[in-house]
Structures are given as structure tokens and as C-alpha cells.
Amino acid sequence: METELSSQDRKDLDKFIKFFALKTVQVIVQARLGEKICTRSSSSPTGSDWFNLAIKDIPEVTHEAKKALSGQLPAVGRSMCVEISLKTSEGDSMELEIWCLEMNEKCDKEIKVSYTVYNRLSLLLKSLLAITRVTPAYRLSRKQGHEYVILYRIYFGEVQLNGLGEGFQTVRVGTVGTPVGTLTLSCAYRINLAFMSTRQFERTPPIMGIIIDHFVDRPYPSSSPMHPCNYRTAEDAGVAYPSVEDSQEVCTTSFSTSPPSQLSSSRLSYQPAVLGLGSADLAYPVVFTAGLNTTHAHQLMVPGKEGGVTLAPSHPTHGAQADPERLVMHMPSDGTHCAATPSSSEDTETVSNSSEGRASPHDILETIFVRKVGAFVNKPINQVTVTSLDIPFAMFAPKNLELEDADPMVNPPESPETTSPLHGSLHSDGSSGGSGGSTHDDFVMIDFKPAFSKDDILPMDLGTFYREFQNPPQLSSLSIDFGAQSMAEDLDSLPEKLAVHEKNVREFDAFVETLQ
């Protein structure tokens, strides 16, 4: 028997599908940033923790997803697709994978929207978190740098699989049945990466002049937010990305298991960037603001890996023009463009050299192995010790020859001459005379007093002790041979024992009376 979907259930279902689509885009894009994500669990979820997952939304990605959806939801014949592609510094591009969220006409009228659909969408989103990290594009995203970057594009409509080449494979993340149709989340990914293996990349300037990590906090929280050169300022444009609280509706539904409806604090520690109206014809990078350098009007402060800043040119260099409708998501791991905060004159020189991009490999290795103490203070490399380094990198620590010479484990001190009575038998004249050195240089006598030893003359090791006491000798009380005494001998001695008892019967009676 088919049941009609109530207006409240329909409203909840549309809200579930809407935010599932937005969270799907966030999960896919964040999995291609090239960085590991570590999120701590919270016992008090906020109203934006949809599907019981604490996924920090990137405002720019949410803005692009909402712009692609344009108020419509994935339905029969309307699919939402997220295309992941690769672009090199020479301008060559290659599509890597396409994620598709679609719906078919198979309905489940008996399923409950308020509980079952919501929980199954949560499980599907968790499956997506795992699947996005097993496809080949994830490994490429972890290695992106100045040679290539990973781009993404969101579109709504028919799935375009022509760019994946021949022999691409598909994987279905999962399906969730609803009263209006069955949601299906799948992925088609490229397996022929010959383009990457045959081309020899050269050291070139970065593709984008502004390369920012999505997960680095602002080094100067008190400074005013900066704006990329492709965007207008907030006063000129008058349009800004909405914050997390504004971009997401509170997760309130008709059932009691929804998260609380109050947002206590902001989920993100950085200020959102501003979208410029005058650059609509240009492809713009998805970046996060970190602070404005007032001294250099054409340079931007970019947060580095160590919490420092790097001065990067605001205008794109060679190969900076990205494809329209594609957004770059990249943070370089190369040490030539990531330096510590200029706290001294030497650090300032390092920042200027790294911004030019002409650092030698030796300088790169030296920068990597410089130990940082405190926030951004550099410790001289000759002060690096094995104990101050992490365990996996202790083997790469520079060895100090003077310390090795004084180490008693490397060069043990000379042992004193022993007076053991066995000394003469162990060291013969022939063995010591042939070497030309003293006898104690060839042999080191150690007073060996093991445990479980009977005496000092006959030492006993643990194995001998264990074997000896594992099979102990029989007790003397158990060694009497009772079989030698026969029953006849017992009967012959019985009259004698009775006669002795009758003779001393009075003594026995007196003893018994004393006991009473």
C-alpha cells in the first residue's frame, strides 16, 4: 500500500538532499587538496554538523556548489557532477575523475524520511570519505607542486566521460532509497596515466602566483583581511562570500535526533575572501585570506607550512591562466616557496631568496634539516643532537666526531689488569708475545657471578638450574620398598605387639583417664 508523502517529510527530504550534495562537494574537493585532514570528535555538535560529521566547510567551495545547483536538486534526469582534472605548468590538462550524484525512478514509499534516509545518507557520506582516498587521483594530489596542480569543476547536467580516455573504470560508492527516487553516488576515474609518466617536467615558476593552503591558520589574526589581485575589495565590489553560519541552514528537522539549532562559534579561523564582479570572465583560484602587507602593495602574505609567511607576487606568472569554470586547489610542499617568519636579518634574506625561486638543492636540504625551537627560532645545525630530533629522522642527524671519540660505547676505556687465578692459563706466552702488546689488550676479564649458582667454583647458569630442579630427586620417605614386606611377616609380629599392649594396659588406662 503506497503512502502519500506529507509536506513536512517532503521539506525534510529536500533539505537532506540539498545538504548532502553540498557536503559531497566539500568531501571530494578537500580530498584533493594534497593534505591530510585530522578532525577531532566533539561531544557537543553544532547546528552545522550535518549527518553527524564534523566537516569544516570551505566558503569558496560552498559558494561554487550553490552557484552550480542554482536552487535545483539532483533528480531524475538531473545529475550533479564534480570533475577533477590536472593542469601542468606548460598549460596541458588532463581529466582524472568525475564524481556523479544522480537519482533514478525507483522509489521506496515505505521508508521513513526522518530517521532511515538521514542515517543512510550519513553512512553514504562516510563511504565517500574512504573512496575518495583510494583512487589514483588522490596519490597525484599528494604530489602536486610547481609541476602541476589539481583543479575541480562543478556542473549540473549530463555526465561528460569523454575526457577520461579509453579504459576508464567506474566505482559505485552507494545508493540510498527515498520515497521520490533512489540516490546513487558513483565515480568514473582514469587509469591510463601515460601522460604523466612520459613527460619530463622542468623547474618552472608556479602555475598560480598565489598558492595557499586551505588548512593553515592566519599568522596575524589581528591584521585586516587581504584580497587577491583578481578580486575587488569589499568596498568596491560589495559582494562577499557568506560565512559558514550564513551559508548553511541550521540542521533542524521534524525529528528529535537532529543536532541543536544554535551555532555557538565560527567553524573556521580565517576570514573569507571577496568575490569581485569585474573578474567574472577570468578563472580565479580558490584561496583563503591571511593578512595584507601594507609596505608592498603588489605582494600578498601567504601562510607557510611552518606557520610563517612567504611573499608571493600577486600577478600570475607563466601558465597562471587556468581554464574557465575550474578552480585551483594547491599548497606546495617545496621548501623553495615556504619559509619561516622573518624574525631576523638572515630569515629575511631566506624569504627574499625563496620568493625568487632560485634556491639551490643544497640550500633546500639545509633548510629542511634546520631544527626549529620555539615558534620560529632557528637553531644552528651544529647544535642538532640525536635526542632533539624525532625518532624516524635520528639517523639523518649530523654526527660529531669529537663526541664519538669521547663516547665510552664507541671507544671503551682500558680495563685494569686482573689478578684472577685463571689469567695465566687463558693468556699463554705464545699468544701474547706474537702480537707485541700487553696481555690485557687482547682479553678482557669480567667477574662473572651468575644467579642460581651453588658456589663460586662451579657456576650454574639459569638453564642448568631449571633442568636440575625440573626433575628433583625422590624424597627419602618415599624410597622404602613396601613390596618386600609380606602379609605373613605382619601376622607373625602381631602377637608380640598385642602382648606388649596387655602388659602396659594399666598405663594406657591411666593416660585415658587424664584425658577425660
Swiss-Prot record:
Q: How is it modified after translation?
A: Phosphorylated by ULK1, ULK2 and mTOR. Phosphorylation status depends on nutrient-rich conditions; dephosphorylated during starvation or following treatment with rapamycin. ULK1-mediated phosphorylation of ATG13 at Ser-354 is required for efficient clearance of depolarized mitochondria.
**Where are the bilayer-spanning segments?**
none
Q: Which Pfam families does the record associate with it?
A: ATG13 (PF10033)
Q: For the region Important for interaction with ATG101, what residue ranges are annotated?
A: 127-134
Protein name, per record: Autophagy-related protein 13
**Role noted for this protein:** Autophagy factor required for autophagosome formation and mitophagy. Target of the TOR kinase signaling pathway that regulates autophagy through the control of the phosphorylation status of ATG13 and ULK1, and the regulation of the ATG13-ULK1-RB1CC1 complex. Through its regulation of ULK1 activity, plays a role in the regulation of the kinase activity of mTORC1 and cell proliferation.
Q: Which GO terms describe its molecular function?
A: protein kinase binding; protein serine/threonine kinase activator activity
